[in-house]
Amino acid sequence: MKNISLLGASGSIGTQTLDVLRSHPDQFRLVAFSAGKNIDYAVKVIQEFSPQIVSVQREEDVLKLQAVSGNTKVVYGSEGLLEVALHPDAEIVVNAVVGSVGLLPTLRAIEAKKTIGIANKETLVTAGHLVMEAARKHNVSLLPVDSEHSAIFQCLNGENEKRISRLIITASGGSFRDKTRDELHHVTVEDALRHPNWSMGSKITIDSATMMNKGLEVIEAHWLFGIPYEQIDVVLHKESIIHSMVEFEDRSVMAQLGSPDMRVPIQYALTYPDRLPLSDTKQLNLWEMGTLHFEKMNQERFRCLRFAYEAGKTGGSMPAVMNAANEVAVEAFLQKRIGFLTVEDLIEKAMNHHNVIARPSLEEILEIDAATRRFVMEQI
């Protein structure tokens, strides 16, 4: 029986993580979770899983939840997130919160020698050097939950990582993959939220449409697998059947395939190095698929992917700036305060405005994050 702490239980990855726990009650126990502002959902999780701790975002929600939480302790805010991440009984901490708020809980959980199931992209994007140094220092495993990084992780099982020639990350292309840039001037929030292949939260669905999601994954892959940016490619693959590939020195390519279902990489992270049945996921029959399609990525068409490569190669504090600018811009688009292509413009402005710090401390990263958010808000 593995004890799990789950940060971000009410989001897309969080709810599917609970699906995995539900499928294997003899294998996993939820000891703590966070649920942001989603109090009704938190009540349901408490009633079903009887965890010891729940964290919510706002202090005013604590009393509401305490009235129905029974023996479950209710905490709140950033300190509450840390309490969930540092639960003494938790062996695995799944970080599924969205945004840079996931950084500090990850670092503290690593220091407490917890195994990390990492679904929070921003942790590695903003502070990859700090996170990987801490993981090495404390001998902690970072297990990828993203389907693309899980695919690479599985392809590398038993392989000599020094023999890697290239990582090939696949991209569905998002909601607007078939639109021209001219057509993107007129797209709506509702259009952007209709992803052709995956069911995800609103922020990541917009990131998928701008291709920033793939850019964040490139930076993540650089840190997780220690591969230079020049050896990480992105290929457009509309069917989302091949989740990523690894090319080795001898030009052989290993690929991980499967029907699009986030529970597969989530469960693999929780069971690694073992596997468990996942009987209600769709079996992949290639003869039903027929043809798989691949296209070279156009970084002028998808400018956010180019920004991510530039930020990653620049290094230091630049990825944190790009990430903070993107979070503010995406939120403004979701609120219908800016157009879709303005997201790119705001990110570019923030990156051009920033003076890079080569090896920022945690405090500097948090300061840069806050300053960038203020700068972008002033531009809107």
From Swiss-Prot:
Reactions accelerated catalytically: 2-C-methyl-D-erythritol 4-phosphate + NADP(+) = 1-deoxy-D-xylulose 5-phosphate + NADPH + H(+)
Keywords noted in UniProt: Isoprene biosynthesis, Manganese, Metal-binding, NADP, Oxidoreductase
Cofactor dependence: Mg(2+); Mn(2+)
Source taxon at top rank: Bacteria
Protein residues bound to NADPH: S10, G11, S12, I13, G36, K37, N38, N120, E122, G201
Record-level GO BP terms: isopentenyl diphosphate biosynthetic process, methylerythritol 4-phosphate pathway involved in terpenoid biosynthetic process
Enzyme Commission number(s): 1.1.1.267
UniProt pathway: Isoprenoid biosynthesis; isopentenyl diphosphate biosynthesis via DXP pathway; isopentenyl diphosphate from 1-deoxy-D-xylulose 5-phosphate: step 1/6
Gene3D superfamilies in the record: 1.10.1740.10, NAD(P)-binding Rossmann-like Domain
SUPFAM superfamilies: 1-deoxy-D-xylulose-5-phosphate reductoisomerase, C-terminal domain, Glyceraldehyde-3-phosphate dehydrogenase-like, C-terminal domain, NAD(P)-binding Rossmann-fold domains
Binding site for Mn(2+): D146, E148, E217
GO MF: 1-deoxy-D-xylulose-5-phosphate reductoisomerase activity; manganese ion binding; NADPH binding
Matching PANTHER family: 1-DEOXY-D-XYLULOSE 5-PHOSPHATE REDUCTOISOMERASE (PTHR30525), 1-DEOXY-D-XYLULOSE 5-PHOSPHATE REDUCTOISOMERASE, CHLOROPLASTIC (PTHR30525:SF0)
Its job: Catalyzes the NADPH-dependent rearrangement and reduction of 1-deoxy-D-xylulose-5-phosphate (DXP) to 2-C-methyl-D-erythritol 4-phosphate (MEP).
HAMAP family with a match to the protein in the record: DXP_reductoisom (MF_00183)
NCBIfam families to which the protein is assigned, alphabetical: Dxr, PRK12464.1
Designated name of the protein: 1-deoxy-D-xylulose 5-phosphate reductoisomerase
Organism field: Bacillus cereus (strain Q1)
Gene name in the database record: dxr
